[in-house]
Regions:
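Regulatory nucleotide-sensing modules
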Residues: 1-43, 50
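Cyclic-nucleotide recognition modules
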Residues: 46-106, 110
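Cytoplasmic (intracellular) domains, linkers, and terminal tails of multi-pass ion channels
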Residues: 4, 15, 88-89, 114
Length: 114
């Protein structure tokens, strides 16, 4: 699975305090934190901090709606960027990855409603 992700992802480096995207932005990619961490927030209110192995930005790929929150890099960070085309290719080629994405989104929705 990781090899397949690596084949379609682009590695990008970000410095501390870099804004990855803002609420309302068009979303055509998602990111996996390879190392470092990012903060998902609405204004100054932190929703969650994500570290190595976490995904961010996947919601906009699935529903094709604008980004629902701001994401800022909290430390020097390496992210793996997956475009929308690569995302759907990955989902279509591996049911385990599709199941994992659905589980991730379901868990985030549960956390948001509790």
């Amino acid at each position: 699975e990781l090899i397949r992700v690596a084949q379609i992802a682009d590695e990008e480096q970000f410095e501390t305090d870099r804004i990855l995207f803002e609420e309302g932005d068009y979303g055509d990619s998602m990111y996996i934190v390879a190392n470092g961490k990012v903060r998902v927030h609405k204004g100054e209110r932190t929703i969650v901090e994500l570290e190595k192995g976490a995904c961010v930005g996947e919601m906009a790929l699935l529903d094709q709606e604008p980004r629902s929150a701001d994401v800022t890099v909290n430390a020097d960070t390496t992210l793996l960027k997956i475009t929308q085309d690569g995302f759907y290719e990955l989902m279509g080629s591996n049911m385990e990855i599709m199941h994992g994405i659905v589980k991730l989104i379901t868990n985030r929705l549960r956390q948001a409603t509790n």
